[in-house]
């Protein structure tokens, strides 16, 4: 029952990624025609089948790789609507780099045995992991060096509602990024407006302790950790010598378009979100309470209680649609998202959060930035908008974050050795 439920739930339209689904359909034909028979065959038949299947899969990824290059060309020449990939997948977003998908496929095939499988076709996760590997390969070998890696918090760096403890496996790879002169930015929905940054210090204390104590980082590298809280509302910089976060005045990093937002429009967005949650609380008799913050409003379960998944989805979609059709929101950007156990409407989004960091750190470009997150569905997910600002990798849990960043560091250091 659980497995069937999860499969049916994952097929909901708003939870799908059309590009990944499209690639899966391309891979279905070689799986059906070349993945091998189930009965006994002549000696060597199975090996020949694997070789042929791998070749066909690789050809498809090579062709998709060329389609992405074609889209990059058209986007750079203001003729994006003529890109073949955009015609085939109308919802496709922006690419910042080429993606070596064929090479990434061979790498992931060794790990996931995609070509050897006869009963399970290439899956959503197979394609997702190939895209992730291709992206970090491209960043490590690009003409412009990687300068900034940003992370979501919950489910990306630590378990939902958790912290980075001193023994967290995420710490060594984050230190590895800093050691390679890459800024680390945590762009989180957690919105703590207190200027001392102490609450972020509690959530990240294991990482902060490791940065302060390590002798493998320079003093400058130790200060290359930043936190953007509330999606795009509060910026803090770590001061290693004092083991604390320093609040950065918004005048130093707020983007020009955000400066035009009026407090009246911001209040209107939060009021509408609160009304949606209040209505759901009453109508569905939810065991929850509503929390109003400076730049966000959310509905969270009472201690020891749980809001069902369908109820969370109903609220996030209701909030999104209500806000989209309301003239009262003015030109304020907002983010309605399902946090896994709660639902929030925040002022701003991760597009603004990542771009604000890029501007603050010296106009870092999207091709020099990677965002790592777990929520990339088109609706109800707060990492989705980061695709407008930077390259991205889509992970499912903190363990995958460790793996992909370790992979990225390996590629960076290998590239440096080859060019030395």
Swiss-Prot record:
It is an enzyme of class 3 (hydrolase). Its cofactor is Mg(2+). It catalyses: IMP + H2O = inosine + phosphate. Keywords: ATP-binding, Hydrolase, Magnesium, Metal-binding, Nucleotide metabolism, Nucleotide-binding. Allosterically activated by ATP. ATP binding is a prerequisite to magnesium and substrate binding. ATP binds to 2 of the subunits in the homotetramer inducing a closure of these 2 subunits and the release of the C-terminal loop, thereby activating the enzyme. IMP binds at residues 152, 154, 160, 188, 342, 350. This is IMP-specific 5'-nucleotidase 1. It comes from Yarrowia lipolytica (strain CLIB 122 / E 150) (Yeast). The gene is ISN1.
């Amino acid at each position: 029952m659980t497995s069937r439920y999860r499969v049916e739930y994952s097929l909901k339209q708003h939870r799908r990624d059309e590009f990944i689904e499209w690639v899966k359909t391309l891979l279905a034909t070689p799986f059906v025609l070349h993945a091998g028979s189930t009965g006994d065959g002549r000696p060597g038949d199975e090996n020949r089948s694997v070789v042929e299947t791998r070749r066909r899969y690789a050809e498809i990824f090579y062709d998709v790789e060329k389609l992405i290059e074609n889209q990059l060309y058209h986007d750079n020449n203001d003729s994006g609507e003529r890109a073949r990939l955009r015609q085939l997948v109308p919802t496709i977003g922006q690419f910042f780099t080429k993606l070596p998908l064929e090479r990434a496929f061979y790498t992931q095939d060794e790990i996931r045995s995609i070509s050897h499988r006869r009963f399970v076709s290439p899956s959503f996760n197979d394609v997702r992991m190939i895209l992730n590997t291709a992206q970090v390969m491209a960043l490590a070998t690009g003409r412009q060096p990687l300068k900034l890696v940003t992370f979501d918090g919950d489910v990306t760096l630590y378990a939902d509602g958790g912290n980075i403890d001193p023994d967290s496996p995420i710490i060594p790879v984050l230190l590895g990024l800093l050691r390679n002169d890459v800024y680390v930015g945590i762009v989180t929905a957690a919105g703590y407006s207190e200027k001392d940054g102490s609450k972020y210090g509690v959530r990240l204390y294991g990482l902060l302790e490791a940065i302060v104590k390590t002798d493998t980082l320079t003093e400058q590298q130790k200060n290359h950790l930043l936190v953007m809280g509330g999606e795009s509302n509060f910026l803090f910089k770590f001061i290693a010598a004092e083991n604390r976060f320093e609040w950065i005045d918004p005048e130093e990093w707020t983007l020009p378009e955000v400066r035009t937002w009026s407090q009246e429009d911001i209040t209107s967005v939060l009021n509408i979100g609160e009304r949606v949650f209040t209505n759901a609380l009453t109508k569905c008799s939810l065991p929850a309470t509503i929390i109003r913050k400076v730049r966000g409003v959310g509905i969270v379960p009472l201690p020891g209680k749980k809001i069902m998944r369908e109820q969370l989805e109903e609220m996030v979609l209701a909030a999104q649609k209500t806000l989209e059709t309301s003239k009262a929101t003015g030109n304020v950007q907002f983010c309605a998202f399902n946090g896994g156990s709660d639902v929030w409407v925040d002022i701003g989004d991760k597009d603004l959060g990542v771009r604000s960091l890029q501007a603050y750190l010296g106009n870092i470009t999207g091709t020099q930035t990677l965002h790592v997150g777990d929520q990339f569905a088109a609706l109800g997910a707060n990492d989705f908008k980061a695709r407008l600002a930077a390259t991205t990798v889509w992970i499912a849990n903190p363990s995958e974050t460790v793996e992909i960043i370790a992979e990225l560091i390996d590629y960076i250091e290998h590239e440096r050795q080859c060019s030395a």
